[in-house]
Design a protein with these regions (language model features):
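Short catalytic/metal-binding and nucleic-acid-binding patches
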Residues: 1-201
Length: 201
């Protein structure tokens, strides 16, 4: 891709104080594992190979619309030690940014896995905000991975970027789609073991 996102695809870590994260719009989210450990799997021959913990994280991301109202999912990709995903909020009474969230396409990438819809796997979301949704997702992944006996923990914070227009949406979506192929150039890159398997289950 020709257009870079913020120069080196770096994402600000602090919430924007001037923005209500319950407003309608699209949000680019990045969450990292604790100490950048390869909990989610490994990349081999340009493909992401999910660990069992990665399968849990993949399934639960796709469950988000069952637990948070008026949410659609854009591009999503698990990497060995982090994930990238786009959340689209489109509540009928929500405020809008510079464009209408209903105009944006939705897309699912990566591993198409699913659970029985409607099962309550997340904590009560409370307000339909980015922080509550991602907080619920991260808590659910940790809870279910640990319950299954898999070592796992998150870095405390997550990174977000408010997507303000369609061009930015398309640029970021392409970055997510090609993230696996560009793994060794990624700012979160750390090497795996020589076998190509992840360090953790």
């Amino acid at each position: 891709m020709q257009d870079k996102f913020r120069g080196q695809y770096r994402i600000p870590s602090a919430r924007a104080q001037w923005w209500d994260y319950g407003w309608n719009g699209a949000y680019f989210i990045t969450g990292c594992t604790k100490n950048k450990k390869h909990y989610f799997g490994s990349i081999s021959n340009g493909e992401m190979r999910l660990s069992r913990t990665g399968v849990v994280a993949d399934i639960l991301w796709r469950e988000i619309p069952h637990h948070a109202r008026h949410i659609s999912l854009g591009a999503f990709q698990l990497m060995p030690n982090h994930f990238h995903g786009i959340l689209i909020l489109h509540a009928p009474d929500g405020g809008d940014g510079d464009y209408s969230a209903s105009d944006l396409p939705t897309a699912e990438t990566g591993h198409a896995l699913s659970l029985q819809p409607g099962k309550k796997r997340f904590r009560n979301q409370g307000k339909n905000t980015v922080s509550s949704i991602i907080g619920g997702y991260k808590a659910a992944v940790k809870k279910h991975a640990n319950r299954l006996g898999f070592e796992f923990d998150w870095q405390t914070r997550f990174h977000d970027h408010i997507i303000r227009n369609r061009q930015a949406f398309d640029t970021i979506s392409q970055y997510v789609l090609y993230n696996v192929q560009n793994w060794e150039k990624d700012c979160f890159y750390t090497p795996g073991d020589k076998s190509g398997f992840p360090f953790h289950t």
